[in-house]
């Protein structure tokens, strides 16, 4: 009885396929997979909701309602924005690291942050997680070789992430 473990959901696969099609990495219909991803995501979360014992399950929307919603969110001029924003929403609080990876890799959804003047160490969103102290204590030679002389910083960008994955506002 705890939260069911998951590696990857069917909705995530549909959103990955939609992204691949939109980028011409593979042949297929990006919009169809995008709509399928929203349908599968909705089904997943309503199925998950039905496992709770603290209250009655919610009534899921009809397939037509989900498809109508998906149609309103599709931006044919920028399919990546539509696809990746919905993928980020799908990951939500259940796969928060995957959601973080999506936005860092793609810049979607567009996120705006204000610098936190009360936080000296981390006034802006982190680019990555630092290595744990045990790694530094027990594997320093390999860690230093991996870092290549660079500092192990919260703000050292990863090679796969966009340098401008969020926008700072004043």
Residue ranges and their predicted role:
Residues 4-25, 33-41, 82-88:
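Extended, hydrophobic/aromatic-rich amphipathic alpha-helical segments that build helical scaffolds
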Residues 42-170:
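C-terminal functional modules
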Residues 25-26, 108:
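Residue-level recognition of short, well-ordered coil/turn positions
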Residues 1:
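Catalytic cores of enzymes that engage adenine nucleotides and/or redox cofactors via long glycine-rich
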């Amino acid at each position: 009885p705890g939260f069911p473990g998951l590696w990857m959901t069917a909705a995530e696969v549909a959103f990955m396929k939609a992204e691949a099609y939109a980028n011409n990495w593979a042949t297929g219909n990006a919009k169809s997979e995008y709509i399928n991803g929203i349908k599968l995501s909705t089904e997943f979360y309503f199925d998950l909701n039905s496992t709770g014992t603290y209250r009655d399950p919610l009534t899921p929307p009809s397939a037509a309602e989900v498809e109508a919603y998906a149609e309103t969110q599709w931006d044919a001029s920028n399919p990546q924005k539509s696809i990746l924003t919905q993928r980020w929403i799908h990951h939500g609080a259940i796969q928060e690291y995957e959601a973080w990876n999506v936005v860092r890799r793609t810049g979607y959804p567009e996120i705006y942050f204000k610098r936190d003047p009360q936080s000296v160490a981390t006034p802006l969103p982190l680019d990555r997680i630092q290595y744990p102290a045990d790694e530094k204590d027990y594997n320093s030679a390999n860690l230093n070789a991996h870092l290549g002389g660079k500092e192990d910083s919260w703000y050292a960008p990863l090679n796969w992430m966009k340098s401008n994955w969020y926008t700072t506002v004043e």
